[in-house]
Amino acid sequence: REAMESRGLGDVYKRQQFFQKENIMLGKFSREFLLNVPSDLKTKNNPSPTVSMVPNGYLLLFGPEHAQEQYLALENHKACEAGTKNIKGSELKQVFPYISEEGIETATYSDTKIEGWIDPYLFHNALKNKAIELGAEFIKGDVKSLKEIKANAIVSAAGCWTNELLNDIPVFPQKHTVFRVKCPKHIPQMPLTGDLTTGVYGRPEGTDYLA
């Protein structure tokens, strides 16, 4: 069985550590939206919706080649009150004793439960159930033909398959592989850790890790 983001079987994360202010603000909005899911998406058929968020936070590691760009990003974080903290690579073990500081010049993280990851399947079902209760109709089937529709804006819900329906829209699937890893030591409180020097990330999942 293929695991795809479009099918709700992939990894879905919630963060505010972006470079652009617009993305930071979107991250802040999504946090409030997710916190209100139990009340805002409650329905008769789904009285207790949840996204099962794990608020372990984000830890991003930067080598000398990426550090300057991240220092600029931190100015936007501060302006947007993103709650991001910054430490030197040499200080890493004071906060995260299980992280190697080798090759790391600086690191940013959050420790106020504002970042983490969610269950995409539960979130999708909560949105779908609420839409149905509000009158939306879901029809299963394949698109066989298209006709011209005049509109100021169109939202494609076809995900990575958009190009199969609308050839002039440059949206294509991109492979993203996630591995489940077993390690001798389990650190359940570990944040999602992204090493920008290697492109590798990892986070706890149950008693294992996803990477």
Label the predicted regions.
Residues 89-102, 209-210:
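Mobile beta-alpha loop/short-helix "lid" or hinge segments that flank ligand
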